[in-house]
């Protein structure tokens, strides 16, 4: 496996005859991101408009992974000084079922951390529903790879959500870590 990081923020990874390209999303990716998150049917689906807006206004804290010019994964994140100047918070992520168990999510997060603009980031955070086990393994592995701490705390309880059917959300936090 090898990484190529361009000045535009794209990272290419070649592995077993399949090339994955990690790049900054554009507003043109909104539809593909919406389609990807809509397909599994297990994640909270927001309006398509929100994915267009995230890809446009949170592009530098987000990443799409593509192979054969098809988006196969994404992370949408935000960085605000109000929340914490050294923390990236991830709002949404998804990987195509053909890419699961291949380390795509971890590599997308590492691609973001390798971007020159985010070298002052020392923490990653995300909220995850209690039944979604894959992110826990991802954050544990990423914290081991980055040789840093890993914490999980209660964030929102089911009772806080309107209506029925939304489970508790946990806050995953890794860090502090040194520059990647």
Swiss-Prot record:
The keyword Transferase applies. Keywords: Acyltransferase, Stress response, Transferase. It holds the Pfam family Acetyltransf_1. One of its GO terms (biological process) is ectoine biosynthetic process. PROSITE patterns: GNAT. Pathway: Amine and polyamine biosynthesis; ectoine biosynthesis; L-ectoine from L-aspartate 4-semialdehyde: step 2/3. Its EC number is 2.3.1.178. Residues 20-180 form the N-acetyltransferase domain. Induction: By osmotic stress. InterPro entries: Acyl_CoA_acyltransferase, Ectoine_EctA, GNAT_dom. One of its GO terms (molecular function) is diaminobutyrate acetyltransferase activity. Belongs to the acetyltransferase family. EctA subfamily. This is L-2,4-diaminobutyric acid acetyltransferase. It comes from Sporosarcina pasteurii (Bacillus pasteurii). The lineage of its organism: Bacteria, Bacillati, Bacillota, Bacilli, Bacillales.
